[in-house]
Amino acid sequence: MSLVVDQLSKSYGHQVAVDHISFHLKQGQVVGFLGPNGAGKSTTLKMMAGYLASDSGTIQLNGIPVHQNSIEAKKIIGYLPESNALYEQLYVKEYLQFLSSVHRIENVSQRITQLIEQTGLGLMQHKKIGTLSKGYKQRLGIAAAIIHQPKLVLLDEPTSGLDPNQLIEIRALIQSLSKEAIILFSTHILQEVTAICDRVLVLHQGKLVADEPISELLQKHNTNLEEIFKLLTH
């Protein structure tokens, strides 16, 4: 499984949000998409997920053009947006059953049981979504993104606003997903990248200013990631 992004661009009027970025990802990697607020991370993820058209450039997932064949591509893409709207009046298990029908999943009961165990939602499955903590809502959002067992998982700020214990649990969950898929998650929190990522993409003012394994980036600049980030985004 591979993802190839080539010369991807997007503007809003005269404002360039994403400026001809290119990169190549493969299965088994947890890749951090790092950049300050407004760098273009969310716009890029929306285009990769097939929810926003690009102005130019291409996105191919295992040879499938995402925008020219969005229905087929979305079958193997999971996406958790930064502002994830959940049906708060539904029960957790009820919501997952609804999503199973949307994705036409076979063996629904088996898949939901597996997913609840994988995401640590066992004690919450019979509770209303509106009563869940921020951490459990994020778990449910991730469960919703991976219910159809996608090969590309895009997570937009999945650890934002979580307490330290929730952070550890969500990090472990994200890492576990990389066994079966390409994982790309955006963040502006440097500790998240160093904690769980193999590789980092750094976006600044819509341009890709770094794309390499974290170990090589640290070795090249001979300093910590915080100083490297300041250097790349100023």
List each language-model region with its residue ranges:
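Conserved ABC transporter NBD signature motif
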Residues: 57-68, 72-73
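A short, surface-exposed alpha-helical micro-motif characterized by mixed small hydrophobic
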Residues: 193-195
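Helical segment within the ABC ATPase nucleotide-binding domain
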Residues: 167-179
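Catalytic Walker B motif of ABC-type/P-loop ATPase nucleotide-binding domains
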Residues: 153-157
